[in-house]
């Protein structure tokens, strides 16, 4: 007999997972001395990194991609990224910005 999953339980589970994610935000130098903001620590098995990246790129008006299980955004967005991730449901206390 197949297991019936309550959609509400699944949503609550995702919210709890969001609040437990330890996220690290830092800067790397890209080609030609340009900066990129790196966001890592979001579980790619539980969350759609492409969707999160798409939302962040729209809010920050920048380009970016998902590579090796991390989100890369063009430019230095450390000052705004913590609030934007919190707006997406991640715990601000667990977001470390370097």
Curated annotation (Swiss-Prot):
GO terms for molecular function: mRNA binding; translation initiation factor activity. The keyword Protein biosynthesis applies. Keywords: Protein biosynthesis, Translation regulation. CDD domains: YciH_like. Belongs to the SUI1 family. HAMAP family: SUI1 (MF_00604). This is Protein translation factor SUI1 homolog.
